[in-house]
């Protein structure tokens, strides 16, 4: 009997071992989204590839350049080209289909949206940061604060001498970004046309003696070397060669200086959104890039660049 039992037990044991081995193989053959070790690459994050262009705002360009550099370091098969000829050029490029992302320091107009629709472009807006637009003078200038009404008078040409504002007897050298700039448009709407705050006078325009400059960098440089100059620039462009003055919404309001803190608190009178525009909701590598810009890491870059991160 023992011989008979042994005769059947051995083959049965072999069958069970083989079945166990095959069962193990079957379990491992199903794809999973987790990794078996720290050195095995995950199957859930596909390799990002592709190239795209970002064109537009001179103000947003330094921020986009940092984001693009970081994103390309993390994704070696991605190429991003960033240029900053102005928000108007960026919006025109989006409408014409010559850029993938328009970076803008102003809101797109209804007229531009209509032009885009006529060309089959579905404008999609994403706010990526906030800016506190700063009014700067030379550090030697004794003026430390101005009202919106006074700023409007300076830029329309009603006030032409610093002594009219309690300063030195010297002609004010008034400088602005050029008409392609979103900052030019925003400052006109938020300051120049707000002489009788809160009423907006759309007939008011920049005075004919205002010097129009092609870049923010040039304006800051001019103010640094000219004690009688005034200019406006994004918060990220401030440095110790110029002085940002406090802005009073009205004569009875306190003067508020531009900073991340005052912009986040909503107390600084000249704050604005910084925007990306795409043709339809972003997808693929462009969506991955914008998701990075909006991530905690991307918003830390906003702060490091001197702009205001989005509230979470």
Where are these regions (language model features)?
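Exported/periplasmic ABC-transporter solute-binding proteins
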Residues: 26-312
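N-terminal acidic, proline/glycine-rich, low-complexity intrinsically disordered segments
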Residues: 1-2, 27
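C-terminal motif of bacterial Sec signal peptides marking the signal peptidase cleavage site
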Residues: 20-24
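Hydrophobic helical h-region of N-terminal Sec-dependent signal peptides
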Residues: 14-18
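Bacterial N-terminal signal peptides that target proteins for export
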Residues: 2-12
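Short linear motifs in low-complexity, proline-biased tails and propeptides
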Residues: 11-13, 299-300
């Amino acid at each position: 009997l023992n011989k008979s039992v042994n005769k059947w037990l051995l083959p049965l044991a072999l069958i069970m071992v083989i079945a166990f081995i095959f069962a193990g193989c079957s379990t491992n053959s199903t794809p999973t989204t987790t990794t078996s070790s720290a050195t095995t690459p995950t199957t859930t994050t596909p390799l990002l590839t592709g190239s795209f262009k970002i064109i537009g705002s001179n103000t947003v360009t330094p921020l986009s350049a940092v984001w693009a550099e970081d994103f390309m370091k993390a994704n070696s098969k991605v190429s991003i080209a960033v240029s900053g000829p102005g928000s108007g050029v960026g919006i025109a490029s989006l409408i014409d289909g010559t850029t993938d992302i328009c970076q803008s320091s102003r809101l797109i107009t209804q007229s531009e949206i209509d032009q885009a629709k006529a060309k089959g472009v579905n404008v999609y807006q994403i706010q990526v940061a906030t800016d506190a637009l700063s009014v700067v003078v030379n550090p030697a200038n004794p003026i430390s604060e101005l009202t919106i009404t006074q700023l409007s008078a300076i830029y329309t040409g009603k006030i032409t001498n610093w002594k009219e504002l309690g300063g030195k007897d010297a002609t004010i050298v008034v400088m602005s970004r050029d008409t392609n700039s979103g900052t030019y448009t925003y400052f006109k709407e938020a300051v120049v046309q707000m002489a009788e705050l809160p009423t907006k006078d759309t007939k008011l325009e920049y005075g004919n003696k205002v010097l129009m400059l092609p870049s923010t960098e040039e304006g800051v440089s001019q103010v640094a070397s000219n004690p009688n100059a005034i200019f406006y620039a994004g918060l990220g462009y401030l440095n110790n060669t110029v002085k940002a003055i406090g802005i009073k919404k009205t004569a009875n309001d306190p003067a508020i200086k531009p900073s991340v803190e005052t912009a986040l608190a909503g107390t600084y009178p000249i704050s604005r959104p910084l925007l990306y525009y795409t043709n339809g909701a972003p997808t693929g590598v462009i969506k991955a890039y914008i998701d990075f810009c909006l991530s905690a890491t991307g918003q830390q870059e906003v702060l490091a660049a001197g702009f205001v991160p989005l509230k979470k």
